């Protein structure tokens, strides 16, 4: 299973994170498929490549709870839900 999750960077007590797409079996700071964003909890800075995130979710990637909460602060989960709903409607119309 492919997950969108956080990869920890930085030194002790000064963590920052990359938002990455990785295999669920890979270690937290191990190999990843693609980096799609960055998050700094100290300055609350969050950068996300929205197109890449939406594309990975369309392809079946699952969000971890922390990444889902970060997406929710950016209102990105609403965009994702609308894209997924429109695809379901299009698939139903195509099957008719």
From Swiss-Prot:
Gene3D superfamilies: 3.30.1320.10. GO terms for cellular component: cytoplasm; small ribosomal subunit. Disulfide bonds: none annotated. It comes from the Bacteria. Signal peptide: none annotated. It holds the Pfam family Ribosomal_S16. The keyword Membrane does not apply. GO terms for molecular function: structural constituent of ribosome. GO terms for biological process: translation. Keywords: Ribonucleoprotein, Ribosomal protein. Belongs to the bacterial ribosomal protein bS16 family. NCBIfam families: S16 (TIGR00002). HAMAP family: Ribosomal_bS16. This is Small ribosomal subunit protein bS16. The gene is rpsP.
